[in-house]
Amino acid sequence: MTAILVTGYRSFELGIFSEKDKRVAIIKKAIKRDLIAYLEEGVDWFIFTGNLGFEQWALEVANDLKKTYPLKTATIFAFETHGSTWNDRNQQHLQQFRATDFVKYSYPSYESPKQLKSYHHFLIHNTDGAYLFYDSEHETRLSYLVAAMKEQPCYPLSFLNFERLNDIADE
């Protein structure tokens, strides 16, 4: 069994506030290519953390790919309270994460930064690599997880970046 952690920018960090934004289609096109490549290499699980944006779009693509590939999806939330303050539209996206093949919560609620460090450790040590939409020139709080991943020997990271998206948009 091979499991890949999928994470990246949240929609608001990209300035995307509508599913109709043309950038979403370009991002999904890149995701589809990359997930198919992973599946052809033998990956069977894609693991998500439940964030809107890149993860949400990757989950949608993975669900479409389930029609032709034998893959499983999982969501490992940091907290049971994840998404509790989201609006109705975003609650629908949250339900997609809760409908994956496996769902687990690390903690009931946030109490200290140690929990996030422990959560990141768990994600890294229970996956075989990561697929990230992240660029170190455009840092977000995801930088803490990326730094922890880079500290691990033999933990492969595959990045989707803005340059590659521009190439896909130009096709």
Curated annotation (Swiss-Prot):
Annotated family: Belongs to the UPF0398 family.
S-S pairs: none
Gene3D superfamilies referenced in this protein's UniProt entry, alphabetically: 3.40.50.450
Protein name: UPF0398 protein Sez_1569
Alphabetical list of InterPro entries matching this protein: YspA (IPR010697)
